[in-house]
């Protein structure tokens, strides 16, 4: 399937009582689509999936699919450190009408490489749905090896990887292997780090699952589209202009800075689920300055 372009790892708006704010979520989805993004992700890390109940997890997927209404690619966060739970979430995502599922590598229990492969192999065999594998060793404690990524690329339903390991040398090995084994046409590599999207596209990535696009969907999409079309001078300019914003969104635990930025912009997306706290006053001053530099407040 075509996964080129800019996909947004969406925040989840909450009411004052910390329940999901469906009205704001639908408004936010429209804001992103009108901003020119190619896809949206519900119940990812930025969407606070770790602190959503199963019912809430399913609800945000349902809202996303309904509100998008075929206008963009819908990606359902469906990962778990229990393979059986991931299987249930992928199957739910398919039944809900999502286009593709995003499945993080199992976290905390730190399976060996064979365990990681078997996790995705079971999902491949038992779920009739395209799956994006998500590799983010800084959060999970495990890193898909080059060999494992290549093996996953050979599975029919594992159609892409969101690669958030910042090691560009490793990525070069991945692309060399994908090319030599004629897998590039059927397997997509997406950036999982906004600041590395441009260099990753230059190596062969087809886009990004982005956090900064929550704030500036149009500019992020324009940067990615220029890079994909080979207009690297323009893409580089836009990437450099976006860098301080990309960086400040991780000045504290994500998605705290992103949600604070959106609230400062008047988007009224609510607070955070514990144990994530609001950002400190000192960092809010820094965040405000960068938002002002980008004419966002």
UniProtKB/Swiss-Prot annotation:
Entry's transmembrane regions: none
One annotated GO molecular function: 2-dehydro-3-deoxy-phosphogluconate aldolase activity
InterPro entries linked to this entry: Aldolase_TIM, DapA, DapA-like, Schiff_base-form_aldolases_AS, Schiff_base-form_aldolases_CS
Record-linked Pfam families: DHDPS
Subunit composition and interactions: Homotetramer; dimer of dimers.
Domain of life: Archaea
Binding-site positions, pyruvate: 46, 209
Chemical reaction(s) catalysed: L-aspartate 4-semialdehyde + pyruvate = (2S,4S)-4-hydroxy-2,3,4,5-tetrahydrodipicolinate + H2O + H(+)
General function of this protein: Catalyzes the condensation of (S)-aspartate-beta-semialdehyde [(S)-ASA] and pyruvate to 4-hydroxy-tetrahydrodipicolinate (HTPA).
Pathway in which this enzyme or protein is active: Amino-acid biosynthesis; L-lysine biosynthesis via DAP pathway; (S)-tetrahydrodipicolinate from L-aspartate: step 3/4
Active site per UniProt: 134 (proton donor/acceptor), 162 (schiff-base intermediate with substrate)
Residue ranges of coiled coil: none
Family from the record: Belongs to the DapA family.
Enzyme class: lyase
Keywords: Amino-acid biosynthesis, Cytoplasm, Diaminopimelate biosynthesis, Lyase, Lysine biosynthesis, Schiff base
Any one of the GO CC terms: cytoplasm
Site (Part of a proton relay during catalysis): 45, 108
Descriptive protein name: 4-hydroxy-tetrahydrodipicolinate synthase
GO biological process: diaminopimelate biosynthetic process; lysine biosynthetic process via diaminopimelate
Listed EC numbers: 4.3.3.7
Species annotation: Methanosphaera stadtmanae (strain ATCC 43021 / DSM 3091 / JCM 11832 / MCB-3)
UniProt-annotated location(s): Cytoplasm
